[in-house]
Amino acid sequence: MGRAREVGWMAAGLMIGAGACYCVYKLTIGRDDSEKLEEEGEEEWDDDQELDEEEPDIWFDFETMARPWTEDGDWTEPGAPGGTEDRPSGGGKANRAHPIKQRPFPYEHKNTWSAQNCKNGSCVLDLSKCLFIQGKLLFAEPKDAGFPFSQDINSHLASLSMARNTSPTPDPTVREALCAPDNLNASIESQGQIKMYINEVCRETVSRCCNSFLQQAGLNLLISMTVINNMLAKSASDLKFPLISEGSGCAKVQVLKPLMGLSEKPVLAGELVGAQMLFSFMSLFIRNGNREILLETPAP
């Protein structure tokens, strides 16, 4: 009995000693872990403080957010016109690119003449004695996007009004024809008046010196009529040969423009001016060595 009791007490002592050693070990390791956690927490806090100090310079550039384009007008940020921007799609983490619609005015402009532009041009013509400046104003003809080879009718009518005031003509019928387009509200009546005097306008245009204001006004009137009425078909057939064979380069270009306009809309010209006749005039230009003039004709 005494021997068994001693063995029992020995086993109990070993168990108590092992438990005490384990407790001491856990207390030591736990203190080290807590110190490491505290150090990591302090490092994270320092990082957060540094980010808070840098955020105003990095993330909040309000000028860039309000104006997402460069000084030259080029868009450099996501969501620019004609580009794409990332939007989160529902139900998932992935982002999808969505097209951005083209922005309207002031990002796109139209090349047209307003009433104020015409008034300013008329004032410049009245005050300027320089023939070069006057010619530049009269020859300015914005293109009509719906009819590539025709010119904007309003700009032609404005140039007619300016040419009428600048270059008087002895023929009263020509003056009446140049005055007729002034009343835009009575366009049908104006077309009738122009039709009465169209032959005189063609004769006066051919007889005048090349590149004169009156010749330019007559050609502008004829170009306008190719767009709105077929009255030019017969008159153009009488006009084009003298100017193409004897006129200057500018006159040849101006005569070829209404011909190309008529060929683009054959309903207006009927059978008088068609693709075959236009081809014959192009051949005439090529035979005379005026290829550069032919290349300038479709240009604005």
UniProtKB/Swiss-Prot annotation:
Positions of disulphide bridges: none
Record key words, sorted: Membrane, Mitochondrion, Mitochondrion outer membrane, Signal-anchor, Transmembrane, Transmembrane helix
A UniProt-annotated Pfam family: Arm_2
Topology versus the membrane: Single-pass membrane protein
Region of interest called Mitochondrion outer membrane (MOM)-targeting sequence, as start-end residue ranges on this chain: 1-6, 26-36
Mitochondrial intermembrane side: 1-6
Spans traversing the lipid bilayer: 7-27
Main location: mitochondrion
Segments in the Cytoplasmic topological domain: 28-300
Renumbered residue ranges of the record's region Disordered: 35-54, 69-99
GO cellular component: mitochondrial outer membrane; mitochondrion
Record's subcellular location: Mitochondrion; Mitochondrion outer membrane
Family note: Belongs to the eutherian X-chromosome-specific Armcx family.
Its job: May regulate the dynamics and distribution of mitochondria in neural cells.
Record's protein name: Protein ARMCX6
Organism: Homo sapiens (Human)
Lineage of the organism: Eukaryota, Metazoa, Chordata, Craniata, Vertebrata
